[in-house]
């Protein structure tokens, strides 16, 4: 596994700190979102890819409450066992993908992406909320890439745009693949058109790979075109 990672800290919506770690052999994005900047502020991690030590270093003085898994693919979970053990944070995933997470997975490309079993503390469904300090995230069930794929949506407030952590559902100019086991073009189309199309154009999209985008940028070229 590649040990280096690129970290970018952004206040993209003007009020919520988000750390972006691009890490691992497949250049995954791992996100740290906190409900404040002070020491001990509650935080969550979305998709613990790559290296747990790098994520722990980036967390610094934050208090990790949740580790949210957008889906069950190895490249997004490699750091999950070590990160959960080190922090005691609660693991969150959809029930349809929790079984694989709790069973563990062998490596697809070698030992580097094998994932040991981890208990999913909270199995969330569409419409559920995750509260983090003063922030309240909404769970969107978005199957298509996997049966239990989810996005995490933080509505905008104080005139600022919302944030969408889209996993491998929506990228900049593309969607996640639908030809893997558990994938479905029909379900992906429904997720895009019934769930993501309802979000405001200004919503900032934090995808599982590559750079940031917005719902408005992807509405015509991906969401409505798929």
Role assignments for model-derived ranges:
Residues 33, 70, 142:
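Conserved S/T- and glycine-rich ATP-binding loop of Class I adenylate-forming
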Residues 6-62, 151-166:
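Conserved beta-strand hairpin/beta-sheet module of binuclear metal-dependent hydrolase folds
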Residues 21-23, 113, 119-121, 141-145:
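Short Gly/Pro-enriched turn/cap motifs at secondary-structure boundaries
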Residues 46, 91-93, 165-166, 207:
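Hydrophobic residues in well-ordered beta-strands that form the structural core
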Residues 40, 106-107, 112, 129, ...:
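Metallo-beta-lactamase
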Residues 17-19, 90, 122, 136-138, ...:
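Conserved beta-strand segments of alpha/beta enzyme cores
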């Amino acid at each position: 596994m590649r040990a280096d990672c690129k970290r970018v800290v952004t206040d993209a919506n003007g009020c919520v700190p988000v750390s972006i770690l691009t890490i691992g052999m497949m250049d995954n994005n791992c996100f740290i979102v906190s409900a404040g900047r002070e020491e001990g502020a509650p935080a969550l991690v979305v998709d613990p890819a790559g290296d747990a030590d790098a994520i722990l270093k980036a967390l610094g003085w934050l208090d990790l409450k949740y580790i949210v898994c957008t889906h069950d693919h190895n490249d997004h979970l490699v750091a999950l066992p070590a990160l959960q053990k080190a922090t005691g944070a609660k693991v969150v995933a959809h029930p349809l993908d929790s079984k694989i997470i709790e069973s563990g997975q062998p490596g697809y490309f070698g030992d580097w992406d094998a994932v040991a079993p981890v208990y999913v503390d909270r199995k969330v469904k569409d419409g559920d909320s995750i509260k983090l300090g003063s922030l309240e995230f909404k769970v969107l069930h978005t199957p298509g890439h996997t049966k239990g794929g989810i996005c995490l949506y933080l509505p905008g407030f104080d005139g600022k745009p919302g944030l969408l952590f889209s996993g491998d559902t929506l990228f900049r100019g593309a969607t996640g693949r639908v030809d893997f086991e558990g994938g479905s073009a029909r379900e992906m189309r429904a997720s895009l058109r019934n769930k993501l199309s309802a979000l405001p154009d200004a919503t900032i999209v934090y995808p599982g790979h590559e750079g940031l985008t917005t719902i408005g940028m992807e509405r015509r070229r991906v969401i409505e075109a798929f």
